[in-house]
Amino acid sequence: MKRLLLLTAALLFAAAASAQPLCCTKTGTELTYAQYDASGTRTGQTRTLVLSCEETDEGLKVYTTEEELDPSGTPTGNALSTSTLVRQNDMVLQLDEMLRGIDPSMLQGMTLGMGGDAYSIPFAMTPGEELPDIRLELKVSKEEQSLSFRINITDRKVLAREELETSAGRFPCIKLQEKFSFRFLFFSFASRRVAWYAPGIGLVREEELTKKGKLESSSELIAIRHADADEEPAAADAGEATAGAK
């Protein structure tokens, strides 16, 4: 009987995950994340606000803004506009629009552009599944000069379904990994990213690791505030990293 119940729960979760987008589509929702270094010390926070959702011919366009906060939660004055295209079976991160949303004062006269493959994440995924590689090209221009950087996102795999608990709540998640690498002239860089996404919420936790698998930094969802909420939930203590896979 216990085995049957566990199997039923797994099937229900799989059905729910395939039916819901792996991002928040409720206008007015605020998602607060804390960033930590390798030792678990909080280094900063970000607050993502869902500004609006707009139906288009391509799908649902979700517009958000990401505000940077210091470790105590005080705004630093830096913010970034982002958008995600939610289609029937996947979501596409609008990287080029994100670059255009960077405050011009931070670019020192440079313009940025992104081309290449769509950065998409499907909604229905199975542990062990491999996702297509992504090839991107970042173009940096200033006056009459320009440089292009090729970015490869490879080794994209669905690792597991896990339940993750943070100070924001408990979430059924799909766990993904991918490898980022780029090379320019004699300089190259590579890192790994592991991310947990929850249906209807989006990113719950992510970890950045060296190519050898050593943790460098992490980010975790610590509070959710809906548009009709009176008060924002209390965040976790500033010195702690609270999440863990259950």
Question: What is the meaning of each model-derived region?
Answer:
Residues 1-4:
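Positively charged n-region of N-terminal signal peptides that target proteins for export
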Residues 20-89, 95-99, 137-246:
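Acidic, serine/threonine-rich low-complexity disordered tracts
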Residues 14-16:
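N-terminal signal peptide c-region/cleavage motif recognized by signal peptidases
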Residues 6-9:
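Sec-dependent N-terminal signal peptides
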